[in-house]
């Protein structure tokens, strides 16, 4: 649930704001330079290659990773994990794998919705504020986007989703002590996720777009 509908509204709201703000900055400058016809393409490339997967992963880290780490951390300190183990059930298979599958599936889906909403909001702001015709905007999007940009965006989102699930569940399952340590594990998980996502973003950008 955390990786799906409960996160989608937040992703859509932030995507509309991000697309509008980014496009206002870009469209204002390009319109002054007489290059308003390129606004849509620049926005689409920026979103697909960097902004959409990175911001989506940060939002999911704040919403989903905190929930995963807190849930599993609470189960650990209240000995529910030990009870599951005593029932001859693998806690990783029972608790971690479903969460990982959810993130691997939903992170690319939410990233794709982020991209669509941000481009749409960018088109609205371009037309309303800078009188760029919708046909010109969308023509620029089609011209500038490469066939591999959207698949590469989804690959980034998938990898980031795996990082979020693995790290948050790992920190939750290794929580020791009492309720106070649950909060510490949750904070540590989010910080570690953001660091790993930033590092992996550099690597994936070079691999997917550096050539």
Task: Locate predicted features.
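Active-site cofactor/substrate anionic-group-binding motifs, chiefly glycine-
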Residues: 2-55, 59
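Hydrophobic alpha-helical transmembrane segments of multi-pass membrane transport proteins
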Residues: 39-82, 110
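Membrane-interfacial helix-loop-helix connectors in multipass membrane proteins
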Residues: 25-48, 116-158, 162, 166-186, ...
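Final/C-terminal transmembrane alpha-helix of multipass membrane proteins
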Residues: 182, 188-205
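Generic alpha-helical transmembrane segments of integral inner-membrane proteins
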Residues: 12-20, 104, 108, 112, ...
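Selective transmembrane-helix segments that form parts of the transport pathway or gating/packing helices
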Residues: 4-8, 12, 51, 55, ...
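Short cytoplasmic-facing helical segments at TM-TM junctions of multi-pass membrane proteins
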Residues: 72-97, 179-182
């Amino acid at each position: 649930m955390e990786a799906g509908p409960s996160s989608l509204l937040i992703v859509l709201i932030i995507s509309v704001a991000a697309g509008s703000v980014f496009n206002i900055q870009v469209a204002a400058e390009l319109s002054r330079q007489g290059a308003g016809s390129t606004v849509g393409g620049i926005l689409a490339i920026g979103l697909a290659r960097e902004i959409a997967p990175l911001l989506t992963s940060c939002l999911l880290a704040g919403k989903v990773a905190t929930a995963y780490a807190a849930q599993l951390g609470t189960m650990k300190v209240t000995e529910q994990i030990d009870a599951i183990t005593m029932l001859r059930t693998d806690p990783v298979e029972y608790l971690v794998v479903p969460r990982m599958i959810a993130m691997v599936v939903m992170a690319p889906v939410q990233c794709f919705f982020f991209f669509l909403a941000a481009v749409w909001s960018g088109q609205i702001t371009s037309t309303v504020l800078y009188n760029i015709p919708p046909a010109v905007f969308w023509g620029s999007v089609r011209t500038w986007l490469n066939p591999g940009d959207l698949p590469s965006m989804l690959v980034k989102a998938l990898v980031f989703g795996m990082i979020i699930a693995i790290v948050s569940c790992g920190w939750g399952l290794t929580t020791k002590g009492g309720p106070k340590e649950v909060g510490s594990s949750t904070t540590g998980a989010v910080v570690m996720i953001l660091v790993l996502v930033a590092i992996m973003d550099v690597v994936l950008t070079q691999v997917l777009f550096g050539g």
